[in-house]
Amino acid sequence: MAEEAKVDVKTSAKKDIRNYLCQYCGISRSKNYLITKHIQSHHQMELEEERDDEACEVDEESSSNHTCQECGAEFKKPAHLKQHMQSHSLERSFTCYVDDCAASYRRKDHLNRHLLTHKGKLFKCPKENCKSEFSVQGNVGRHVKKYHSNDNRDKDNTGLGDGDKDNTCKGDDDKEKSGSGGCEKENEGNGGSGKDNNGNGDSQPAECSTGQKQVVCKEIGCGKAFKYPSQLQKHQDSHVKLDSVEAFCSEPGCMKYFTNEECLKSHIRSCHQHINCEICGSKHLKKNIKRHLRTHDEDSSPGEIKCEVEGCSSTFSKASNLQKHMKAVHDDIRPFVCGFPGCGMRFAYKHVRNKHENSGYHVYTCGDFVETDEDFTSRPRGGLKRKQVTAEMLVRKRVMPPRFDAEEHETC
């Protein structure tokens, strides 16, 4: 018995305790951290391949499970996708329970935001001489940041007192953002070429008249300045170059070029995808079909909303359109500034500002002589017939802005 006990002790002492194996080469170690250290030092390529495979699987799962089938929007969580799908539904299940209010919404958070309007405008602007009131507290901070961020600097420069009224402080929670960032003089002195003083053409931050750093578009002939780099990146996508064109719209009469397939698909969905109305048979874009169907629903149509200002007979179908009318016409709020340096013209609507920038108002060439546009003006009613322009006149023509005088021309 004693001899058998000695044999068992010897065999137990020689027992292999290396229980942790490497999954790549099969080597064994006695401790788990030794195997981990071995894998990190000898199997780096295998680990990188596994990480790439896992990332691809995660991307496939997220794209397949959390992508909207209607518009192609992607979400990280299925709850966000479910909430987004409610915006595509025509059913408005969340109805306002306040008397004499027929407002209804597709999402509950939109209803909660609407209920704040019934409680009145409880939040006022903390600045003096500003009577703006808001129903949501978050709009107060947005209003102060937009209209009162440079009050102290403006008072020092212009000498305005506390009792003076600032005409630009008449707005409320306007969520539209202008591409120029609200700076009247952007990139002044660079000739509108979008290049910095060094002449390298990089989009570096520039100092505007309000003291805020802005990034300038480096495209030749553009020179627009933006407050955030993300706005500049979105603007630079509009400058489609021939070497970066990958897709174009093949619809008749369109033939627009795009840098990638995603931009082309979004363009087709918004501009060329039409749906016929089942009620009246009219043809509408897919993005406008929901608004058209609400016109057939008598219960949801609120009727015409009249402007309460005396002497104004304007009527609107939506309260949001009435608010835009009040800001532009009666309050004379013009938040959108022309992006060309030295212009300073302000507009109440963004599309009017864009039309002004795209027109030939700022396109001119400094010539050796002063020439008017009398021969190019349209024929007035009851006036003389317009003269026929010769080829020599077209070659010698210089298009000049109305404010351009002879003295400034001689200095060019």
Swiss-Prot record:
What terms describe the molecular function in GO for this protein? 5S rDNA binding; 5S rRNA binding; DNA-binding transcription factor activity; RNA binding; zinc ion binding
Q: Which SUPFAM superfamilies match?
A: beta-beta-alpha zinc fingers
Q: In which tissues is it expressed?
A: Expressed in seedlings, flowers, siliques and seeds.
Q: Which PROSITE patterns match?
A: ZINC_FINGER_C2H2_1, ZINC_FINGER_C2H2_2
Which keywords has UniProt assigned to this entry?
Answer: Activator, Developmental protein, DNA-binding, Isopeptide bond, Metal-binding, Nucleus, Repeat, RNA-binding, rRNA-binding, Transcription, Transcription regulation, Ubl conjugation, Zinc, Zinc-finger
Place the motif Nuclear localization signal on the sequence: 384-391
What Gene Ontology terms describe where this protein resides (cellular component)?
A: cytosol; nucleolus; nucleus
> After gene disruption, what is the outcome?
Lethal.
Q: Where is the composition biased (Basic and acidic residues)?
A: 148-188
Zinc finger spans (C2H2-type) are: 20-43, 66-88, 94-118, 123-148, 215-239, 247-272, 275-296, 305-330, 336-362
Q: Where is this region: Disordered?
A: 144-207
Record's Pfam families? zf-C2H2
Highest taxon listed in the record's lineage: Eukaryota
Entry-linked InterPro entries: Zinc_finger_trans_reg, Znf_C2H2_sf, Znf_C2H2_type
- State its location(s): Nucleus; Nucleus, Nucleolus
**Cross-link named Glycyl lysine isopeptide (Lys-Gly) (interchain with G-Cter in ubiquitin), where?**
185
Additional detail? Binds in vitro potato spindle tuber viroid (PSTVd) RNA.
Task of the protein:
Essential protein. Isoform 1 is a transcription activator the binds both 5S rDNA and 5S rRNA and stimulates the transcription of 5S rRNA gene. Isoform 1 regulates 5S rRNA levels during development.
**Protein name per Swiss-Prot or TrEMBL:** Transcription factor IIIA
Organism, by scientific name, is Arabidopsis thaliana
Give me the gene this protein comes from.
TFIIIA
